[in-house]
Amino acid sequence: MRKLALDLGTKSCGFAISDLLGIIASGLDNFIYEENDFIAVLAKIDEIMINYHHEIDTIVLGYPTNVYDGSKNKRTYLIESFYTLLKQHFLNHEKIKIVYEDERFSTKIATQRLKNSCVKAAKIKKVKDKMSAVVILESYLSKNHFN
Protein backbone atom coordinates (compact mmCIF):
# COMPACT_ATOMS: atom_id res chain seq x y z
CA MET A 1 0.00 0.00 0.00
CA ARG A 2 1.02 3.59 -0.60
CA LYS A 3 1.79 6.31 1.94
CA LEU A 4 0.79 9.95 1.36
CA ALA A 5 2.79 12.74 3.02
CA LEU A 6 1.72 16.34 3.56
CA ASP A 7 3.80 19.42 4.27
CA LEU A 8 0.93 21.67 5.33
CA GLY A 9 1.17 25.44 5.50
CA THR A 10 -1.43 28.18 5.85
CA LYS A 11 -1.69 28.80 2.07
CA SER A 12 -0.07 25.78 0.45
CA CYS A 13 0.40 22.08 0.96
CA GLY A 14 3.10 19.91 -0.52
CA PHE A 15 2.12 16.32 -1.29
CA ALA A 16 4.35 13.29 -1.80
CA ILE A 17 3.41 9.66 -2.36
CA SER A 18 5.21 6.36 -2.04
CA ASP A 19 5.28 3.44 -4.42
CA LEU A 20 3.17 0.38 -3.54
CA LEU A 21 6.09 -1.24 -1.70
CA GLY A 22 6.62 1.83 0.49
CA ILE A 23 10.22 2.26 -0.60
CA ILE A 24 10.35 5.26 -2.95
CA ALA A 25 8.90 8.71 -2.22
CA SER A 26 7.93 10.94 -5.14
CA GLY A 27 6.73 14.53 -5.20
CA LEU A 28 3.09 14.74 -6.20
CA ASP A 29 1.75 18.28 -6.00
CA ASN A 30 2.27 21.74 -4.59
CA PHE A 31 -1.33 22.67 -3.80
CA ILE A 32 -2.17 26.37 -3.31
CA TYR A 33 -5.38 27.38 -1.50
CA GLU A 34 -6.98 30.32 0.29
CA GLU A 35 -5.43 31.00 3.68
CA ASN A 36 -6.46 28.36 6.24
CA ASP A 37 -8.97 26.74 3.84
CA PHE A 38 -8.30 23.24 5.09
CA ILE A 39 -11.56 21.96 3.60
CA ALA A 40 -9.88 22.51 0.22
CA VAL A 41 -6.94 20.41 1.43
CA LEU A 42 -9.30 17.61 2.48
CA ALA A 43 -10.93 17.75 -0.96
CA LYS A 44 -7.47 17.49 -2.56
CA ILE A 45 -6.69 14.44 -0.41
CA ASP A 46 -9.98 12.85 -1.51
CA GLU A 47 -9.02 13.54 -5.14
CA ILE A 48 -5.62 11.90 -4.62
CA MET A 49 -7.27 8.89 -2.96
CA ILE A 50 -9.50 8.44 -6.00
CA ASN A 51 -6.63 8.94 -8.46
CA TYR A 52 -4.64 6.24 -6.66
CA HIS A 53 -7.61 3.85 -6.48
CA HIS A 54 -7.73 3.97 -2.68
CA GLU A 55 -4.30 2.29 -2.46
CA ILE A 56 -3.23 4.70 0.31
CA ASP A 57 -3.26 3.26 3.82
CA THR A 58 -1.26 5.92 5.69
CA ILE A 59 -1.30 9.71 5.71
CA VAL A 60 1.94 11.16 7.07
CA LEU A 61 1.54 14.69 8.37
CA GLY A 62 4.67 16.79 8.81
CA TYR A 63 4.89 17.87 12.46
CA PRO A 64 6.65 21.21 13.01
CA THR A 65 8.35 22.00 16.30
CA ASN A 66 11.03 24.45 17.36
CA VAL A 67 14.32 23.41 15.80
CA TYR A 68 16.50 23.58 18.89
CA ASP A 69 14.36 22.18 21.70
CA GLY A 70 11.47 20.42 19.96
CA SER A 71 8.88 22.52 21.78
CA LYS A 72 5.55 23.38 20.18
CA ASN A 73 5.03 26.60 18.27
CA LYS A 74 2.16 28.34 16.46
CA ARG A 75 2.40 26.02 13.44
CA THR A 76 2.40 22.94 15.69
CA TYR A 77 -1.04 23.88 17.01
CA LEU A 78 -2.26 24.52 13.46
CA ILE A 79 -1.10 21.03 12.41
CA GLU A 80 -2.69 19.45 15.49
CA SER A 81 -6.01 21.11 14.58
CA PHE A 82 -5.72 19.81 11.02
CA TYR A 83 -4.86 16.33 12.36
CA THR A 84 -8.16 16.36 14.30
CA LEU A 85 -10.02 17.49 11.17
CA LEU A 86 -8.32 14.75 9.15
CA LYS A 87 -9.22 12.09 11.75
CA GLN A 88 -12.87 13.19 11.64
CA HIS A 89 -12.85 13.23 7.83
CA PHE A 90 -11.57 9.64 7.68
CA LEU A 91 -13.56 8.38 10.68
CA ASN A 92 -15.30 5.68 8.62
CA HIS A 93 -12.07 4.60 6.91
CA GLU A 94 -10.59 2.30 9.54
CA LYS A 95 -7.82 1.18 7.21
CA ILE A 96 -6.31 4.67 6.92
CA LYS A 97 -3.71 5.45 9.54
CA ILE A 98 -2.83 9.11 10.19
CA VAL A 99 0.57 9.76 11.74
CA TYR A 100 2.91 12.64 12.52
CA GLU A 101 6.48 12.81 11.27
CA ASP A 102 9.04 15.32 12.51
CA GLU A 103 9.51 17.90 9.77
CA ARG A 104 12.35 19.88 11.29
CA PHE A 105 14.83 20.83 8.55
CA SER A 106 12.65 19.28 5.80
CA THR A 107 12.34 22.57 3.89
CA LYS A 108 16.04 23.28 4.31
CA ILE A 109 16.97 19.78 3.05
CA ALA A 110 14.53 20.04 0.13
CA THR A 111 15.80 23.48 -0.86
CA GLN A 112 19.42 22.30 -0.71
CA ARG A 113 18.64 19.27 -2.87
CA LEU A 114 16.99 21.52 -5.45
CA LYS A 115 19.94 23.93 -5.44
CA ASN A 116 22.35 20.99 -5.83
CA SER A 117 20.32 19.95 -8.88
CA CYS A 118 20.81 23.44 -10.36
CA VAL A 119 17.13 24.34 -10.08
CA LYS A 120 16.58 28.09 -10.44
CA ALA A 121 15.37 30.08 -7.41
CA ALA A 122 12.00 30.90 -9.01
CA LYS A 123 11.33 27.20 -9.61
CA ILE A 124 12.49 26.28 -6.09
CA LYS A 125 9.83 28.55 -4.63
CA LYS A 126 7.16 26.76 -6.68
CA VAL A 127 8.14 23.20 -5.74
CA LYS A 128 9.78 23.39 -2.30
CA ASP A 129 6.63 22.34 -0.38
CA LYS A 130 6.24 19.28 -2.60
CA MET A 131 9.91 18.43 -2.13
CA SER A 132 9.63 19.00 1.63
CA ALA A 133 6.80 16.45 1.64
CA VAL A 134 9.19 14.04 -0.11
CA VAL A 135 11.77 14.56 2.66
CA ILE A 136 9.08 13.99 5.32
CA LEU A 137 7.90 10.82 3.58
CA GLU A 138 11.46 9.51 3.13
CA SER A 139 12.02 9.98 6.85
CA TYR A 140 8.83 8.08 7.68
CA LEU A 141 9.56 5.28 5.19
CA SER A 142 13.11 4.79 6.46
CA LYS A 143 11.80 4.26 10.01
CA ASN A 144 8.78 2.15 9.08
CA HIS A 145 9.87 0.14 6.06
CA PHE A 146 9.39 -3.27 7.67
CA ASN A 147 6.22 -2.45 9.65
UniProtKB/Swiss-Prot annotation:
It comes from Ureaplasma urealyticum serovar 10 (strain ATCC 33699 / Western). Belongs to the YqgF nuclease family. PANTHER family: POLYNUCLEOTIDYL TRANSFERASE, RIBONUCLEASE H-LIKE SUPERFAMILY PROTEIN. One of its GO terms (molecular function) is nuclease activity. Its main location: cytoplasm. Transmembrane segments: none annotated. GO terms for cellular component: cytosol. This is Putative pre-16S rRNA nuclease. It is found in: Cytoplasm. Its EC number is 3.1.-.-. InterPro entries: RNaseH-like_sf, YqgF, YqgF/RNaseH-like_dom, YqgF/RNaseH-like_dom_sf. It comes from the Bacteria. Could be a nuclease involved in processing of the 5'-end of pre-16S rRNA. SMART domains: YqgFc. Pfam families: RuvX. GO terms for biological process: rRNA 5'-end processing. Keywords: Cytoplasm, Hydrolase, Nuclease, Ribosome biogenesis.
